[in-house]
């Protein structure tokens, strides 16, 4: 039976910001004495990390990875760009990708509780506290996403600005089109589309744009309004929809045409299934 109450355990967590497992270990070692447990955690280099958790985190890195079963992307924030480029911090982020892939997780809270692939004696939350102690700044795992990948898909990853913006592209019809998928991912980072296709634009967005166009054309004949509105929607789709955009490396070709050409050349039914685009803080 434990020599401490749940209230003591809660107090230790609130005071130090250290994970549940290590707090239990500390209280067991200290036979339920709160102050001794704090000292125990300080000796492990964990306790002082909790003091940093209120600090604002505006910098950071986005990282992505893929294995044979899925793709992972994670955003981790810190206080300064200096630490965002620190090798210890970067190693922690790389480990998170393995944890996401191994556990197939998109929930940050659930991710915090799994055993770290980098340090099996610690949870992800506890390793985060150790890393905070090492780099001297608050660290926040802001978001994570796991996407399953099948044997007939190619995944492209492109990172810009040392992890300030990252795109993932999922291309179906072949597992040998990583170069094409990466080219499209690079295009996404540069052009920042909001939607995959015209068909994927939400109805409320279309209605909003139509209202804007109508207001701009107030007083004109209906047939003129309809003609101009059609042109404005074409421009809107070319600006916001990935498949309608001009390819950044060859503006005479849209992304859809780029994929169609590759499909014809390879004899494979290629299709952009979806994409993910993240920017730091966005």
Swiss-Prot record:
It holds the Pfam family EF_TS. It comes from the Bacteria. It is found in: Cytoplasm. Gene3D superfamilies: 1.10.286.20, DNA helicase RuvA subunit, C-terminal domain, Elongation factor Ts, dimerisation domain. GO terms for molecular function: translation elongation factor activity. One of its GO terms (cellular component) is cytoplasm. Keywords: Cytoplasm, Elongation factor, Protein biosynthesis. Residues 80-83 are annotated as: Involved in Mg(2+) ion dislocation from EF-Tu. Belongs to the EF-Ts family. Associates with the EF-Tu.GDP complex and induces the exchange of GDP to GTP. It remains bound to the aminoacyl-tRNA.EF-Tu.GTP complex up to the GTP hydrolysis stage on the ribosome. HAMAP family: EF_Ts (MF_00050). This is Elongation factor Ts. It comes from Chlamydia muridarum (strain MoPn / Nigg). The lineage of its organism: Bacteria, Pseudomonadati, Chlamydiota, Chlamydiia, Chlamydiales.
């Amino acid at each position: 039976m434990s020599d401490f109450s749940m209230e003591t355990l809660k107090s230790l967590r609130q005071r130090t910001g250290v994970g549940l497992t290590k707090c239990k270990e500390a209280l067991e070692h200290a036979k339920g004495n709160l102050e001794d447990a704090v000292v125990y955690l300080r000796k492990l280099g964990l306790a002082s990390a909790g003091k940093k958790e209120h600090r604002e985190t505006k910098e950071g890195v986005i990282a992505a990875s893929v294995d044979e079963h899925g793709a992972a992307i994670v955003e981790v924030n810190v206080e300064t760009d200096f630490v965002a480029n620190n090798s210890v911090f970067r190693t922690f982020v790389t480990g998170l990708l393995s944890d996401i892939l191994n556990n197939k997780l998109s929930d940050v809270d659930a991710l915090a509780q799994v055993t770290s692939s980098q340090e099996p004696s610690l949870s992800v939350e506890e390793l985060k506290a150790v890393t905070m102690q090492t780099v001297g700044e608050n660290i926040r795992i802001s978001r994570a996403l796991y996407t399953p990948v099948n044997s007939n898909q190619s995944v492209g990853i492109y990172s810009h600005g040392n992890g300030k913006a990252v795109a993932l592209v999922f291309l179906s019809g072949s597992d040998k089109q990583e170069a094409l998928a990466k080219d499209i991912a690079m295009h996404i980072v540069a052009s920042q589309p909001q939607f995959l296709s015209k068909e994927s634009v939400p109805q409320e967005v279309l209605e909003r744009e139509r209202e804007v166009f109508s207001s701009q054309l107030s007083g004109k004949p209906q047939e003129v309004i309809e003609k101009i509105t059609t042109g404005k929607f074409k421009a809107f789709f070319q600006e916001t929809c990935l498949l309608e955009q001009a390819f950044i490396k060859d503006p005479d070709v849209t992304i859809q045409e780029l994929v169609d050409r590759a499909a014809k050349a390879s004899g494979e039914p290629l299709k952009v299934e979806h994409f993910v685009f993240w920017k730091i803080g966005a």
